[in-house]
Structures are given as C-alpha cells and as structure tokens.
C-alpha cells in the first residue's frame, strides 16, 4: 500500500497530525526498509472497564496494525497511581497499587476484542519508571519549566483562579513523555485533551537524541447525551463488557446526528459507504432507525459475536413492538439546558398536554411513559440534554430533542 493510501486511512477521524509531512516521510522509509513503525498509545487503568470512548484510539491502533506496523498498548500502571490532571480543576485522588493492577488485568482482557494479539505488544510503564532513582526523576524534571507547564490550559486556569496545583501533577506530562523515550515511539496517539503531553514526548525524545514522534490526536467521543465526553462518572457511557442487549438498546437511544459521528469513529464502514448511507437517509430511502440498528449490530457483534447481535436486535424489536412505539412521531426541538427539566413541563412543550399542571396529573394517574418506562413521580426531572420519547396514553407520542 502506497504512502498516500496509508495516509488516507490514518487521517480518517483524526483531529490533527503533527507533523503530517514528517509522518509521510516515516511511512516512506518504513516501506523502503521493511521496518514497521512503532505506534504507541497509553491508557491509565483508573477504572476496571473500557467504554466506547476508549475504543476510538484502539480502532486507530488496529488500522496501523492492518497497515503492517507495530502497536504498543501501554498500560500506565505507574502513572495511574499519580492520576492524570488533564482537564481537571482539582487534584485527582491517587489510586492504590492494588487498584491499578486489578484494573490493568481487565484492560488486557478487553483490548484484544479490537486489537490483534499477535501484533500487539502490551507494556507497563512501571517497567522503567519504577526503576528511576530520585536523581533520575530530578534530571527528568529539569527538562521543563513551570512557565512551560502553565501553558497547559487546565494548569493555566487553575493558577489564574488561585486553585492548588501539586508538584507531582507537573511531573505527569514529563513522565508520560518519557514513556515515548523508553519505547522509542515513532508515532503516539491520544485524545485532543492529551496534545500537550504528546508534544512533551517529542521534546524529550530530542533531548535523548531520538527522532521525535509524530503525534496524532483523535476526537473525544461524546457520550449518550451527545454533549459531554463519554465518561463513566457522568453515566453517559457504553461499556464494551456490558450485556449485548444493553449495548444495543443504548445505541438505539442516541440522536441521529450522534449516530453519524459514531459511524465515523467506531464503524468499519468506509467513508464512501458512510457518505452513501447519509445520502440514503437524506433521500428517505433509509430510515434513521434502520441505520441505528445496523450500527448497533456491528458494535454488539464486535464485542459479543454475531449470534448475540442478532438476539439483541430481536429482543429490541420485540420490546419496541410490545410498547407499540411508532417510528414516526412529532418532534419537539428544545435548547439544551444545564441542570434538569420537569417532565410535566416537557409534556406541555411537546403538545401532549395543555399545561404543566395537566402533565403532572397525567403522570400521577399512570398515563405517561418515558422511553417506554412508566413514570409515576410528578416531580420527576430529566437532564436537559439528549433525546426522550414521551408517551401519553396509548396512542400519543412525541420525541423531545435537546440541541
């Protein structure tokens, strides 16, 4: 495969490549010498389960494997005990060694649902970081300045707002960067929020007389709400170890707009096939629900197998039919709101009832369902993001969409 063909695959879904020309030269050299590039991506095992947000990087790693390159799946068992401060307004609570190792074992089991185990090198950064002396660590710290660290957006904001920044948090980008030195990485992948740390890796490789790694940043996958980064703490995630029915149902609940983003970042369909699907949806030849089912089947099959995917679809269709929810229904577009919104108000906004008070009475009488589930709490509040299917009585439906 030519350099141009490889670059077309590598660019898919990527936010930024630093530096693109440099990466092209590395691929050209790899093709001429037959020596594969070494691709690195690190994951701190701060929680036991991987979710679809993590798999954006894993899919890009698999693409590199398919192009014939070597992939290093780095488990940050050492850095996980420090806690990545990226995007945080306060110091993260450190994990114990026991917690980190327990989570790391589950990562090893889960990643091979995506990566080819025969082409994957699994490494733990404690192998080299755990052997560093105090002198080594001071030498590493000497490679940067406080001013440089404050260029990081989150550190800069905390400093400006007079919020504490621990010294060990300044060390995190340097330690992550040193991983690239230890592995002699040619390319490092990371989320857009990791760009600063990835560039520190380039700087440190120059210090250690290595060729600086190319950096590829990937977008942060939005969670089920379509607004926030997918996160277990926000409850808007899809875990790859969740039951097949649950994964299928969660994917069917996302907005049509978010579905197309999931196709681009999570599906094995080519970009041409995705564009064809978009056109078919625009022309009315393919209903969005059918497109979601296709995506849900693909993702469930990846983690649970084709039979489980078929069964999950049958189960979803059966539940959908039993609830008699129509595919077509009135849609009410509302501006996304911070906090929560009373269900009674949403019923009125959707035109299912004439007033908020009538909505509360309908809820009390057991005549209202949200996403197929009966609701009896007339003071129920729903997050002002994402989508909801509201049902009043047996025949009246409306879809609420927060944008």
UniProtKB/Swiss-Prot annotation:
ATP binds at residue 232. GO terms for biological process: tyrosyl-tRNA aminoacylation. Pfam families: S4, tRNA-synt_1b. Its EC number is 6.1.1.1. It is found in: Cytoplasm. Gene3D superfamilies: HUPs, RNA-binding S4 domain, Tyrosyl-Transfer RNA Synthetase. A motif ('KMSKS' region) lies at residues 229-233. CDD domains: S4, TyrRS_core. A motif ('HIGH' region) lies at residues 45-54. Catalyzes the attachment of tyrosine to tRNA(Tyr) in a two-step reaction: tyrosine is first activated by ATP to form Tyr-AMP and then transferred to the acceptor end of tRNA(Tyr). Belongs to the class-I aminoacyl-tRNA synthetase family. TyrS type 2 subfamily. Homodimer. This is Tyrosine--tRNA ligase. It comes from Geobacter metallireducens (strain ATCC 53774 / DSM 7210 / GS-15).
